[in-house]
């Protein structure tokens, strides 16, 4: 009985510690989501003035975007990504993509040129993935005329900056393997690594899975998390 009692107490203590750890993770995510402007402390990053471009960049929640901007973001995503989705096991589903872009948890980086024309956006969220507090990048979409001028790299670097300032452990994103340009961009130019939750590492999907999950750790995520059980979020 004595041994069973000790084991029971140890299990209870472990559960309490796990709950406390998850509560701390959720608190960080909630604090990040309550910010008015995560980019506000870094005004120098609100301008991109190089390679013939003069862009202004703002960070806001989806609730602060007008319908015209939301429609533009959807159409740009469709133009850039529909074929890639159709070549994957996911397929292209317009209703689901629009719902994803307009989810109440969505944050945006919006880039405009000197005439206030919309030229690029990033859709991201502060969230919990597999027990870790993360900044999850859903979309990085650019109009053709501003590509290959450093805009995409600059926007992702902003994500890394905000992830550090909000004490997230890493920036995470999903990329199609057959989207060779994007895959090389994140792996080579930005030094993202294949995440431990990616199908090719976790073994959760077959070998012909068409996507990888990539990540880049912040200064708060130096030690990889030891996951148990299924991946799930909180704070919703």
Curated annotation (Swiss-Prot):
Keyword GTP-binding: no
Binding site for substrate: 85, 127-129, 138, 174, 211
Positions that bind acetyl-CoA: 140-142, 148-153, 179
Keyword vocabulary terms for this entry: Acyltransferase, Cytoplasm, Lipoprotein, Myristate, Nucleus, Transferase
Primary location: cytoplasm
The EC number(s) this enzyme carries: 2.3.1.257
Name of a matching Pfam family: Acetyltransf_1
Superkingdom of this protein's organism: Eukaryota
Catalyzed reactions per annotation: N-terminal L-seryl-[histone H4] + acetyl-CoA = N-terminal N(alpha)-acetyl-L-seryl-[histone H4] + CoA + H(+); N-terminal L-seryl-[histone H2A] + acetyl-CoA = N-terminal N(alpha)-acetyl-L-seryl-[histone H2A] + CoA + H(+)
GO MF, any single term: histone H2A acetyltransferase activity
InterPro entries: Acyl_CoA_acyltransferase (IPR016181), GNAT_dom (IPR000182), NAA40 (IPR039949)
Keyword Transmembrane belongs to the record: no
Location in or out of the cell: Cytoplasm; Nucleus
Positions of the record's site feature: Essential for catalytic activity: 139
Lipidation (N-myristoyl glycine): 2
Family affiliation: Belongs to the acetyltransferase family. NAA40 subfamily.
Role this protein plays: N-alpha-acetyltransferase that specifically mediates the acetylation of the N-terminal residues of histones H4 and H2A. In contrast to other N-alpha-acetyltransferase, has a very specific selectivity for histones H4 and H2A N-terminus and specifically recognizes the 'Ser-Gly-Arg-Gly sequence'.
Name of the protein in question: N-alpha-acetyltransferase 40
Natural source organism: Xenopus laevis
Gene expressing this chain: naa40
């Amino acid at each position: 009985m004595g041994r069973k009692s000790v084991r029971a107490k140890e299990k209870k203590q472990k559960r309490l510690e796990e709950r406390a750890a998850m509560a701390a993770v959720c608190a960080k995510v909630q604090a990040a989501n309550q910010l008015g402007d995560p980019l506000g402390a870094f005004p120098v990053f609100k301008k991109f003035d190089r390679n013939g471009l003069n862009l202004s960049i703002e960070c806001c929640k989806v609730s602060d975007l007008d319908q015209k901007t939301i429609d533009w973001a959807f159409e740009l995503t469709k133009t850039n990504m529909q074929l890639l989705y159709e070549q994957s096991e996911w397929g292209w589903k317009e209703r689901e993509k629009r719902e994803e872009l307009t989810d109440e948890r969505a944050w945006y980086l919006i880039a405009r040129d000197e005439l206030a024309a919309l030229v690029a956006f990033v859709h991201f969220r502060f969230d919990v993935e597999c027990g870790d507090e993360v900044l999850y990048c859903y979309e990085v979409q650019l109009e053709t005329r501003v590509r290959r001028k450093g805009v995409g790299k600059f926007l992702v670097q902003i994500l890394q900056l905000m992830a550090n300032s909000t004490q997230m452990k890493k920036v995470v994103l999903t990329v199609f393997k057959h989207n060779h340009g994007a895959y090389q961009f994140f792996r080579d130019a930005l030094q993202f690594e294949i995440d431990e939750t990616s199908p090719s590492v976790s073994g959760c999907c077959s070998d012909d899975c068409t996507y990888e999950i990539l990540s880049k750790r912040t200064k708060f995520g130096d030690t990889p998390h030891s996951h148990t059980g299924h991946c799930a979020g909180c704070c919703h």
